[in-house]
A protein has these predicted regions:
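Core dinuclear metal-dependent hydrolase active-site scaffold
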Residues: 1-53, 133-197, 322-329, 335, ...
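Short secondary-structure boundary/capping segments
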Residues: 99-103, 109-110, 200, 225-227, ...
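Hard-cation-handling environments
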Residues: 232-372
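Gly/Ser/Thr-rich loops at beta-strand to alpha-helix junctions
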Residues: 11, 64-66, 163-164, 248-255, ...
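Cap/insert and terminal regions of metallo-dependent hydrolase folds
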Residues: 168, 189-277, 362, 367, ...
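Metallo-beta-lactamase
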Residues: 100-163, 292-331
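Active-site neighborhood of phospho(di)ester-bond hydrolases with catalytic His/Asp-centered motifs
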Residues: 29-31, 55-64, 71, 83-86, ...
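Pre-active-site segment of Zn-dependent metallo-hydrolases
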Residues: 10-12, 22-81, 85-136, 188-199, ...
Length: 462
């Protein structure tokens, strides 16, 4: 009998992995890293409950590491199947997975050097070379038509609006005359969109819906995001400080560049030097320029007019380590956009270590900060450790919730209301417990749907 098993993104927003089984074949949807709390990160080191060589296919909703970052380990442990994703997700993964492997090696080397790992020696989950090798399995999906993997599984993809290349995935599962349709929402984007196409409403008639619940317990502010962003930058500049923005290299950095360009062109903000200090974000921005198929009409019109959407005045793309270090010597107001978005690693950690103790500076969070991450600790004003030492927090801490790449519960419910027929069963995933339970109650009360919160390793007979 066909089945669905939840191998991640239950009780947390990380580690997305879902396993479909039918007719002796296995298809995995997403293959992400667990991040944040130590108890979650330790799952990355535990063997999967099924042997990787027994999985024939993997399909990806989008390129974020909490959905793709375990792939090199899966391949290292014996997966020999094919990985299907949108063209933009394939291109983004070519950047992000090798970078993740490099960071894994870097963190292990640093732990060995400083001796703060309990393991001797500390080893990377996978290496740069292993990440590069895993990319050999990737294949791009043609969104315009279904992809029949076998007599048991057929895939279709739809725009999800979360980041460049993000897709919902519909899987048709056939076994012993039974046909089941399952929709994986992936990470659902906002309504309306700043740059990308909005999430579509696929055809109705799903037997199962797996729905994300990141913001299942809150609404994003509806105030003018540009006005607030400009106000934070201007007030910091008046103090002679630096605005440090931990930003996801994919999606959020490009939205910030788009907004800064608009604000400066409209005279709503003075032009300051903007430094994108993330080789990954720089490469991703180039991909955003190339994959116009994901643009909404407004962004496409800008390109047609010769306007570069992601190039505000006085923007600097700091590729080299020397360029990054040079920012330490700057003593006038600037904006630094750097990865990672939750401050778990990357160049942003050095900028935070330097800028957090100075009251003139502002640390601006522009995305979700998962429990247990350095970003969540800073956001809450709690003691935070960097490179083995606690750092004093004297800088102003601001959060811009409007820029989230995830739909809030109002937007999710609005999307669900467009379904002409309720799914047979809805499972909530990709949310911390309070958020998922809150959304469950709202969906049950407002839509009268059969809905529950999925649990880790739960197996459902389809």
């Amino acid at each position: 009998m066909s089945s669905l098993t939840f191998l991640g993104a239950t009780g947390t927003v990380t580690g997305s992995k879902y396993l479909l089984e039918a007719g002796g074949e296995r298809l995995m949807i997403d293959c992400g890293l667990f991040q944040g709390l130590k108890e979650l990160r330790l799952r990355n080191w535990s063997p999967l409950p099924i042997p990787p060589p027994s999985i024939q296919w993997l399909a990806l909703t989008h390129a974020h590491l909490d959905h793709t970052g375990y792939i090199p380990r899966l391949v290292k442990d014996g997966f020999k199947g094919q990985v299907y994703a949108s063209p933009a997700t394939v291109d983004l993964s070519k950047l992000m997975l090798p970078d993740s492997g490099h960071l894994q090696e870097e963190n292990a080397a640093y732990a060995n050097k400083k001796g703060f790992s309990k393991h001797d020696p500390a080893l990377p989950l996978y290496t740069y070379a292993e990440a590069v090798k895993s990319l050999e399995s990737f294949r791009a999906i043609d969104e315009s038509k279904p992809l029949e993997l076998s007599s048991h599984f057929t895939l279709r993809c739809f725009s999800a609006g979360h980041i460049l290349g993000a897709r919902m995935i519909e899987v048709t599962v056939r076994e012993n005359g039974s046909v089941k349709r399952i929709l994986f929402s992936g990470d659902l984007g906002r309504f309306p969109q700043l740059i990308l196409r909005e999430p579509v409403v696929p055809e109705d008639g799903f037997d199962y819906l797996l729905l994300e619940s990141t913001y299942g317990d809150r609404l994003h502010p509806r105030d003018d995001v540009g006005a607030r962003l400009a106000s934070i930058v201007e007030s910091t500049a008046q103090r002679g400080g630096t605005v440090v923005i931990p930003s996801f290299a994919v999606g959020r950095t490009q939205e910030l560049l788009y907004l800064f360009r608009e604000l400066i062109e409209q005279g709503r903000m003075h032009s300051l030097p903007i430094h994108v200090d993330s080789p990954m974000a720089i490469d991703v921005t180039d991909l955003y320029r190339r994959h116009e198929e994901d643009y909404d009409l407004q962004t496409g019109a800008l390109e047609a007019q010769g306007i570069k959407p992601f190039s505000p005045p006085d923007v600097h793309f700091d590729e080299s380590v020397e360029d990054s270090k040079a920012l330490n010597a700057v003593h006038y107001p600037i904006i630094i956009i750097s990865a990672s978005g939750m401050a778990t690693g990357g160049r942003i950690v050095h900028h935070l270590q330097r800028c957090l103790p100075d009251h003139r500076n502002t640390i601006l969070f522009v995305g979700f900060q998962a429990a247990g991450t350095r970003g969540r600790l800073i956001q809450a004003g709690q003691p935070v450790k960097m490179y083995g030492q606690y750092v004093n927090i004297r800088a102003r801490i601001e959060t811009l919730d409007n820029l989230s790449g995830h739909a809030d519960y109002g937007e999710i419910l609005g999307w669900l209301h467009k379904f002409q027929k309720a799914p047979g069963k809805t499972f909530l995933v990709h949310g911390e417990p309070a958020a998922a339970e809150s959304l469950r109650q709202k969906v049950a009360q407002e839509l009268q749907w059969d809905v529950s919160v999925a649990s880790y390793l739960q197996k459902v007979q389809l």
